[in-house]
Amino acid sequence: MMELSTRTLGDWLEHWALTTPDKEYIVYSDRNLRFTWKQFNERVDHMAKGLLAIGVKRGTHVGIWAGNVPDWLTFLYACAKIGAVAVTVNTNYKQAELEYLCQNSDMHTLCIVNGDHGNDDYVNMVYAMLPELKTSQRGYLKSKRFPCMKNVIYIGPEKYRGMYNTAEILLLGCNIDDDELLEAKAKVNCHDTVNMQYTSGTTGFPKGVMLTHYNISNNGFLTGEHMKFTSDDKLCVCVPLFHCFGVVLATMNCLTHGCTQVMVERFDPLLVLASVHKERCTALYGVPTMFIAELNHPMFDMFDMSSLRTGIMAGSLCPVELMKRVEEKMFMKVTSVYGLTEASPGMTASRIDDSFDVRCNTVGRDFEFTEVKVIDPETGEECPIGVQGEMCNKGYNTMKGYYKNPEATAEVIDRNGFLHSGDLGVKDEEGNYRITGRIKDMIIRGGENIYPREIEEFLYQMEGIKDVQVAGIPSKKYGEAVGAFIILHEGVEMNEFDIRDFCDGKIARYKIPKYIFFVNEFPMTGSGKIQKFKLKDVGLELCRKQGIEII
């Protein structure tokens, strides 16, 4: 029978280290690096003792700023075993974002690698943030701007002034008695915060979402159950670990099912195909653009994908044609998960047994042990079947809250315990949900409510349009007017009159975009989400440059 577990992340790791000690857990196929459950658990214990040696304890905030490197998960579980909180840092962050997060999270220890995108020099960014580091003895950092910050660890063998490296942390751990580690482990409770993730800031400043062992291990377990995972599965993980998709839907699924996690350090379609082929992976995750890159790779046909059986496509609307190609060419029954970081993250999911139509056109049903409701934002009442409202969730997966921000927490979790997603959705007769837009994205033009998603989906039907976003542009006359931001396929030429002609007579006049902008890209967050709230400013700036009068 399916039930929620009160095991901590450390308990789960030790369970498999005892039950299946010699089974492979973490595999980096490209470098033939392999850890069994027993080996990995031992490395985690050594790292946990090393963290204790540098003053990390229960409740301490430890940042991990790295791609999917082998010791990323070692640090996550080492924190989990001693009750510390792993703060995941987006690898796309630049100086200002890093400083904001370190300050806001009261970070004590920061673990880094050097950036893998030519211009991202994490080491120098850290020195710019903590100039005292270059003249400090390791472990004795005193920063004026970041008084909580005491240590920086470089994940790897390289040595940098003022920073520990991994080998030194493991060595320091040898001085810590096993009893001290056991004592620290004994104090950890499944309802303690284990992971803090910063929301990507689609609506302003990022907030630290506090997630517990209970939140994420159970969400990962149920995600795996929806795809009928067993300990025989091998999941290829090419999505970033700093995001819920990687650390919960992937890592926690493997942790709670005792299966093998085949890691890809940084997304590369060729490396993904080679890893699936060589390791005989049974499942693969990705966002639509990743699957497109894999399918379109000129060497795709050289690899055997027949071992695959399932996986998750998430992150944005999954195109029907892409789903079909993945099922035909990669032999996978693709499922999708809808949620948000604040819901650990999964709220609804399609199941492997669902029909293609359900898996392709909906985000499935509620997760077990949760209550998902579509609520009318005006009245607070539950909407009838087929009527659009706000997607809300109550259950084991609701975050503990935003770090040091009770006001923002109270804004999203109501007095009945429902987490308000800010997303609009509808429920059908079978209990499956469709996401229809964002409440905050809604355009109010002269009293008419306009949902951008509806216009976007309509414009997608026009040949030549690769991507489109619709947002409100301030209007003196109507309050807001409809603005469409369009990316065209390569080689396609189109003007605003073509767009209006296409709309004419097919959608209501007030929904036809008044402002049409042809752009090369949209403003994005570090984790690849479109920042719709910035489109308004982009539109105003483009109007100014093009001499368009806003009325």
Where are these regions (language model features)?
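Gly/Ser/Thr-rich phosphate-binding loop
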Residues: 171, 278-286, 295-358, 371
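Conserved pre-ATP/AMP-binding loop-to-beta segment of ANL
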Residues: 21-24, 145-149, 153-160, 164-198, ...
